[in-house]
Amino acid sequence: MPSVVVVGTQWGDEGKGKITDFLSSNAEVIARYQGGDNAGHTIVIDGKKFKLHLIPSGIFFPEKISVIGNGVVVNPKSLIEEIAYLAENGVSANSLRISDRAHVILPYHKKLDFLQEEAKGDKKIGTTIKGIGPAYMDKAARVGIRIADLLDKEIFEERLRTNLEVKNREFVKMYDSEPLEFEEIFEEYYEYGQQLKKYVTDTSVILNDALDAGKRVLFEGAQGVMLDIDQGTYPFVTSSNPVAGGVTIGSGVGPSKISKVVGVCKAYTSRVGDGPFPTELFDEVGHQIREVGHEYGTTTGRPRRVGWFDSVVMRHAKRVSGLTNLSLNSIDVLSGLETVKICVAYERSNGEQITHYPASLKELADCKPIYEELPGWSEDITSCRTLEEIPEAARNYVRRVGELVGVRISTFSVGPGREQTNVLESVWGV
């Protein structure tokens, strides 16, 4: 029962969608296990760019099953729009399966997300205002509405009415904001549920049956380890667990059925929104990396913050997600730089060096990155298909990344296309 988990090892936007799409060719089931439409992944097929937020990358393979697991929070409106977007581009969603246990994002979640973020003033955490956090809050508070509830008119009406009464009191009394209308939400979202009904099932059964039958299953995470609510740069994190351990909770598959964990990273680092970023660049080199790498958020369109590769972050990701393999993306973006740097440790103001990522943001603010400098390369490597074809300086960089992280590099990418992903070692064993 071979199964592979794909996780982002930085702050998201590492190219997980591209790697999932690439690995999907040898998988029979592809499942998303956490997050919501706050995450975006871009896939390039035959030169055409597709941007998805909820539906797994495997949807481009009609013979494979694509699963939205119970750990995902689903905005029905966004999902229906995404299905329509795919249809307009000749891609069918007939192979999609949605967990009946997944929780639903409703208009009051998005409104609350906005109001809470605005109330923080200059202490905003950089939420995408998609309602993700409030939906997970309701789930933990045991007042959430699941897909199974959305499909049952009586249950949906009862729970929506109860929840909206509470939320409207909060909007009016705490935020001096207008209440939401029950009827409008009820009619609109019940109809969304009916449109999605044909895709809804117990996806835990599908996934476990597939694994028990020896089928190859690929699990696709959203965001990245450094945005994990437990292991990330709290409170500048998402509301779920992108780490590999999140698979078992968010898909209904036991940990004994996970074979390999592929960590996806870029040859540099990027981040959207606020929060600590030790290797961030503010100079012309940072600007060049941002422009060459097209570092603008898939969901928000916001310019991403960029910086040098941070092996301290990567070793943290390796430890907390149990990485077995590494997929190194966007090496081509570094072409043209005279020198390239890798952060190998942090130095505190008292001169002490540390090689682990601190939990305390105050402690982290006291740290400066210690860099190892390597020669850069000027050649265009976007057409290279083997490690031997890329310049020696680029080869040395790739090898050094693997050494510092302590994980085998199974693939490296020199561009956004499928054909620009090069295999050093198959994680499927094929």
Swiss-Prot record:
GO molecular function: adenylosuccinate synthase activity; GTP binding; magnesium ion binding
Main location: cytoplasm
Keyword Ribonucleoprotein: no
One biological process term in Gene Ontology: IMP metabolic process
InterPro entries: Adenylosuccin_syn_GTP-bd (IPR018220), Adenylosuccin_syn_Lys_AS (IPR033128), Adenylosuccinate_synth_dom1 (IPR042109), Adenylosuccinate_synth_dom2 (IPR042110), Adenylosuccinate_synth_dom3 (IPR042111), Adenylosuccinate_synthetase (IPR001114), P-loop_NTPase (IPR027417)
Database matches in SUPFAM superfamilies: P-loop containing nucleoside triphosphate hydrolases
Binding residues annotated for Mg(2+), in chain numbering: 13, 40
Binding site for IMP: 13-16, 38-41, 128, 142, 223, 238, 302
Annotated binding of GTP, by residue: 12-18, 40-42, 304, 330-332, 413-415
Active-site residues annotated for this sequence: 13, 41
Catalysed conversion reaction: IMP + L-aspartate + GTP = N(6)-(1,2-dicarboxyethyl)-AMP + GDP + phosphate + 2 H(+)
Swiss-Prot/TrEMBL keywords: Cytoplasm, GTP-binding, Ligase, Magnesium, Metal-binding, Nucleotide-binding, Purine biosynthesis
Subunit and interaction comment: Homodimer.
Name listed for the protein in its UniProt record: Adenylosuccinate synthetase
Organism: Lactococcus lactis subsp. cremoris (strain MG1363)
Lineage start: Bacteria, Bacillati, Bacillota, Bacilli, Lactobacillales
